[in-house]
Amino acid sequence: FTGSFDTVYAGSDVVAVKLLLSQDTGGAHPNTAAVGVNVDPKTGRQLALDDALVLTGMTLEQVAAESLAQLKAKLGPDLISPQGADPKPENYGTFLVSASAVTFVLQSYQVAPYSSGMQEISFPRK
């Protein structure tokens, strides 16, 4: 395994860190997964999906519908697994909070081939 991290946002309300974890399984490329860690620095509590949705002012169904529309426009025929954007908590569990947005990260292969990379869909914070 290898790993790296990037501080996405360090504000008074949220500290967000993006972790990238890779494993070489002997294939053509490593398997990489993103993990979003979003913490309220005042309480130490890690934010959950419900918290992210509150920050956007949207429901999971609304986020999923807009995500699918953006993915169709961006990926076209490379959108091979649209069900990866269905309104299920497991599809939107990886997210990163910034000062102005909540960005949901869809893992490699979740909606598109590895060559298309991880997909990120951002929504303004309300």
PLM feature spans:
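Compositionally biased intrinsically disordered regions enriched in Thr/Gly
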Residues: 1-126
